[in-house]
Amino acid sequence: MNQIDAIEMAQMKKNIPKFIPGDTIKVQVKIVEGDKSRIQAFQGVCLGRQNGGIRESFTVRKISNGVGVERVFPLHSPSIEAIEVVTRGQVRRAKLYYLRKLRGKASRIKERKYVAGQ
């Protein structure tokens, strides 16, 4: 292992849940305003994951007051406090950019069902 890999491994978070595009996730983001800090939740559908390793990021989309809002989060950012998987979605694509054009019930994602023991 070279020095760059060792530094990257030390900076990577260990407590990240497994999630894939289509999952509804809640991201707890630390926001610092002046000398105060607070935690803000951003809940939406994961549209995709990009890159890998320390540079990995993911895109989350939600509808807020009838307007679509997308946010790209670096996966290993220190400003992310926690990531929670709310529901697991069943999709057949790695990038769900087609959801940007859909409105209302058409933009719903089928929920993935699990069999005990898997």
Swiss-Prot record:
GO biological process: translation
GO cellular component terms given for this protein: cytosolic large ribosomal subunit
Listed Pfam families: Ribosomal_L19 (PF01245)
PROSITE patterns: RIBOSOMAL_L19
GO molecular function terms attached to this record: structural constituent of ribosome
Segments traversing the membrane: none
The entry's keywords: Ribonucleoprotein, Ribosomal protein
Domain of life: Bacteria
Xref: InterPro entries: Ribosomal_bL19 (IPR001857), Ribosomal_bL19_CS (IPR018257), Ribosomal_bL19_sf (IPR038657), Translation_prot_SH3-like_sf (IPR008991)
Gene3D superfamilies on file: 2.30.30.790
Its biological purpose: This protein is located at the 30S-50S ribosomal subunit interface and may play a role in the structure and function of the aminoacyl-tRNA binding site.
Family: Belongs to the bacterial ribosomal protein bL19 family.
Protein name: Large ribosomal subunit protein bL19
Organism: Citrifermentans bemidjiense (strain ATCC BAA-1014 / DSM 16622 / JCM 12645 / Bem)
Gene name in the database record: rplS
